[in-house]
Regions:
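Structured C-terminal subdomain patch of bacterial secreted/periplasmic proteins
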Residues: 27-45, 130-195
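Structural recognition of the beta-strand scaffold that forms the well-ordered cores
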Residues: 11-15, 75-80, 106-109, 130-134, ...
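Short helix-initiation/N-cap motifs at beta->coil->alpha
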Residues: 111-120
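Extracytoplasmic/secreted envelope proteins and their assembly/folding machinery
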Residues: 1-5, 34-41, 51-54, 58-61, ...
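Extracytoplasmic ligand-binding site segments that recognize negatively charged/polar headgroups
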Residues: 9-39, 73-94, 142
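Short, structured coil segments at secondary-structure junctions
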Residues: 6-9, 102, 161-162
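Proline-aspartate-enriched helix->loop->beta-strand connector
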Residues: 1, 9, 120-136
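Basic- and aromatic-lined ligand-binding clefts that recognize polyanionic substrates
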Residues: 48-102
């Protein structure tokens, strides 16, 4: 924003995407998604449509939650990419909010970032029970990620890998936006088959 202001260009800082600009903000939550849409509604003078959209999302989230089995304390790991060190979602990333809204726990939610790298040792030590595999819809997608995890010397012994407990979620379903809600439904349905 500082580089554009001198040119008279107004900017909007998106909460999840620009976390590096405000490390004092709260953890990711669905409320942050809703507030972003409210902000956009105000900017484009579409407040009524924004409120209706948010109301519909909240209703759908309530519907998803009403069908949940007890996922309390279930350990989930989101694997985006990386073989030397896994790239994953931290406490400011929307997937953490989605996982927590389902009552489960993102094992990397202690990472003080939205997205970042951790170690395989830390992931294996947390023994995830369920995996969210990011599917960029290129190459082998989630199948390739799972094949890698099955061959990894530490990860192959984790509960999620041994039980092939995972769901493939597309990138756009995990970045803040309308697709988050149905991605939560996909996650809940896949978790129901495991737990």
């Amino acid at each position: 924003p500082e580089t554009l202001t001198p040119y008279g260009i107004k900017t909007l800082i998106l909460n999840e995407s620009c976390v590096h600009l405000d490390k004092n903000r709260p953890r990711a939550s669905l409320d942050l998604l809703y507030s972003e849409v409210e902000r956009l509604g105000k900017i484009f003078r579409k407040e009524a449509k924004a409120k209706k959209l948010i109301k519909n999302w909240k209703s759908r989230v309530s519907e998803i939650k009403s069908k949940l089995v007890n996922y309390s304390g279930k350990r989930v790991f989101l694997y985006d990419s990386g073989e030397d060190k896994p790239f994953t979602a931290g406490k400011f990333a929307m997937p953490t909010a989605m996982i927590e809204a389902l009552g489960a726990e993102n094992i990397t939610s202690n990472m003080d970032t939205s997205w970042g790298r951790t170690s395989w040792e830390a992931v294996a030590a947390a023994d995830p029970e369920f995996l969210i595999l990011l599917d960029y819809q290129s190459g082998g997608g989630a199948a390739d990620l799972m094949a890698f995890l099955k061959s990894h010397p530490a990860m192959k012994y984790t509960s999620a890998v041994k039980n092939e407990a995972y769901v493939a979620i597309r990138y756009e379903e995990l970045t803040p936006g309308p697709a988050n809600i149905e991605a939560m439904a996909k996650m809940a349905e896949a978790m129901k088959e495991v737990f």
